[in-house]
């Protein structure tokens, strides 16, 4: 599965990375059916859903694209976040233009991620390199993320509450349109394709958490 490399590095095949990606997606789906009454359980549901929507699709696309035979872990994660956000925005355009609800778009994203993972697992070439330096950086980022998670984002201002309402509507609407996203009926929102809101709506729908909690965290 993995072997030590020269220095303080470990090489992991893209096959193993693809299996890990599938496990993350499966965990996100499985955690949906767990209760969220406890703090740790709610955090687990939110984190797995965020990884499944905001990192895994782009990471799999990066490993399929494979600009180099060996990619570092931070490169896979960094490209994964950037590409995943782009994919979510394209899905948001599709959802609003074709009036497709969050459950259908989530299914499309899950199918695409599964197909990319299977293709990645079948590929015999490609490595993900984990170095000690990157593990230190990831540890610091993890510590920062825990602090920011506990701190949360303010939701007391009127503008924040409007954003939360749009996230909630995107997660619940069966037929999203330009004129039904905003809290005022028939009024077109200033951002016709709110990609960031749709990203949070997909996470809320996948994790089965309240959109207010997702926005706050």
Which ranges hold each PLM region?
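Membrane-embedded, hydrophobic transmembrane alpha-helices
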Residues: 1-130
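Generic detector of bulky aromatic hydrophobic side chains
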Residues: 72, 89-93, 101, 136-142, ...
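Active-site lumenal/periplasmic loops and adjacent helix-entry segments of GT-C-fold
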Residues: 133, 140-217
